[in-house]
Amino acid sequence: METVLEQLAGLESFPSPYFDEDDFFTDHSSRDALDADDFLEDDVDFLAGQIQDYYRDSRVLHTDDDYCDAGNFSFSSSSSGGFPYECGDGGCDLSPGMKGGSLVMKRRRRLRSDAEMQQLRQAANVRERRRMQSINDAFEGLRSHIPTLPYEKRLSKVDTLRLAIGYINFLSEMVQSDLPLRNPNSDSGNQPKKVIICHRGTRSPSPSDPDYGLPPLAGHSLSWTDEKQLRDQNVVRTAKVWTPEDPRKLNKSPFSNIENEPPLTLCLDM
């Protein structure tokens, strides 16, 4: 036991710890007295180089007088804490409170590069092509629903709209003329409406006919006639048929005259 105590007592004569807490948490290099102006000058030199590069690039894109020349741009540091900078000609002397804001605004007003402008133009062209394609598809659908003459070339958009207006007016006139003929007591309104295809007569037209020399054309007519009255009957009717006219001939009406038309045969589905 005494031997053990003697060994423990010998620890008191052990030298100080291998490292001090201050040495462990503190860098020896930081103990050296450094001048704050040295750090400030290094930062100012770094910023001056960056801004000189920026103004050198901006001078190529801009020719305005409000941009400083990169060669005449200089920084000066002082112990007052400010960061004044000035141009060689004295035209860009700014107060310390407006330095950062002015630089940011000039960066925002910088012109886009050629690559960015090319991308914007390509995107605008794609949007315009899609818009025109949608318009062309809509006109193709409209042409497919309007009875037209066998033109040598496709109708233009203006002619297509004129034909559509004439056809809609014709259908509206047919509906309005048929309303007084309806019997309110009959149930013909509940019957399905049918579109009947009408053809010109098979007789040879005379030279006095307005359609002499033209091929027979198909028109469209609407019928709400009660089919019960037409059972077991061979009915031949004539009706006003809308014949598509050339929209480029403005002196002609899109409505055909019933007196000048040959008899029309209505093929009724009995």
Curated annotation (Swiss-Prot):
GO molecular function, one term: DNA binding
Keyword flag ATP-binding: no
Keyword Nucleus applies: yes
SUPFAM superfamilies on file: HLH, helix-loop-helix DNA-binding domain
GO cellular component terms listed in the entry, alphabetical order: cytoplasm; nucleus; transcription regulator complex
Keywords, ordered alphabetically: DNA-binding, Nucleus, Transcription, Transcription regulation
Chief location: nucleus
Protein origin, superkingdom: Eukaryota
InterPro entries tied to this protein: bHLH_dom, E-box_TF_Regulators, HLH_DNA-bd_sf
Subcellular location: Nucleus
Start and end residues of each bHLH domain: 119-171
Xref: PROSITE patterns: BHLH
Gene Ontology terms describing biological process: developmental process; exocrine pancreas development; generation of neurons; hindbrain development; positive regulation of DNA-templated transcription; regulation of DNA-templated transcription; regulation of transcription by RNA polymerase II; retinoic acid receptor signaling pathway
Function of the molecule: Transcription factor implicated in the cell fate determination in various organs. Binds to the E-box consensus sequence 5'-CANNTG-3'. Acts together with pdx1 to induce the pancreatic lineage within the endoderm. Plays a central role in directing the differentiation of retinal progenitors towards horizontal and amacrine fates.
PANTHER family linked to this entry: BASIC HELIX-LOOP-HELIX TRANSCRIPTION FACTOR, TWIST (PTHR23349), PANCREAS TRANSCRIPTION FACTOR 1 SUBUNIT ALPHA (PTHR23349:SF59)
Protein's name in the database: Pancreas transcription factor 1 subunit alpha
Source organism (scientific name): Xenopus laevis
Underlying gene: ptf1a
